[in-house]
Amino acid sequence: MSPDLLGALLVAAGYLAGSIPFGVVLGRLVLGVDVRTVGSGNIGATNVARAGGKKMGVLVLVLDAAKAIVPILVARRVLGGTPHAEFWVTAVAVAAFVGHLFPVWLGFKGGKGVATGLGIFAVLAPWAALAGLVGYAVAYGLTRISSVGSLTGTALCAAGGFATYGPRHPVSWAGLAIALLIFVRHRENIRRLVRGEEKKV
């Protein structure tokens, strides 16, 4: 099998892995609720924490990050040393992220991508991920508003990706695209922030 065909198959697998809706699955199995019907209706860690407590929220956060981390690590191992390996590994990362936002299992209606994006940066640009985590902690600590922390951390991750790789590397542009999509998915949160109506967590 050619490396490019293998890369394409890994991209498809990355999308399917990213599509696993851990928030919905654990909500039903552990909490007995569909998290899409409570709180904000989002399937991510913050809304799961609202429905089932902080421990459940942390578990979903870890799993949503892992569903990007695992496909990326597999792609690195399988494609390491082959032509275009960097491109395909980055494509697998983006596919996992897109899977979370548009999961085939939920009619393409998914989450906002913060945890999955963090998982991607943790593997491809660890220092950027660290900057994002610090940014989240500081912004959330000052405001007690989850979306402010998430957006701050996302912006720092994207900036850190460019600082790590420069403007010509696929990871830099993938990171920027991921950050822009996260901001788009938070557009209602941003509107509420502007109006002073965003809830504290």
UniProtKB/Swiss-Prot annotation:
One of its GO terms (molecular function) is acyl-phosphate glycerol-3-phosphate acyltransferase activity. One of its GO terms (biological process) is phospholipid biosynthetic process. Pathway: Lipid metabolism; phospholipid metabolism. Its main location: membrane. The chain crosses the membrane at residues 5-25, 55-75, 87-107, 118-138, 164-184. One of its GO terms (cellular component) is plasma membrane. It is a multi-pass membrane protein. It comes from the Bacteria. Its EC number is 2.3.1.275. InterPro entries: G3P_acylTferase_PlsY. The keyword Iron-sulfur does not apply. Coiled coil: none annotated. Keywords: Cell inner membrane, Cell membrane, Lipid biosynthesis, Lipid metabolism, Membrane, Phospholipid biosynthesis, Phospholipid metabolism, Transferase, Transmembrane, Transmembrane helix. The keyword ATP-binding does not apply. Belongs to the PlsY family. Probably interacts with PlsX. This is Glycerol-3-phosphate acyltransferase. It comes from Anaeromyxobacter dehalogenans (strain 2CP-1 / ATCC BAA-258).
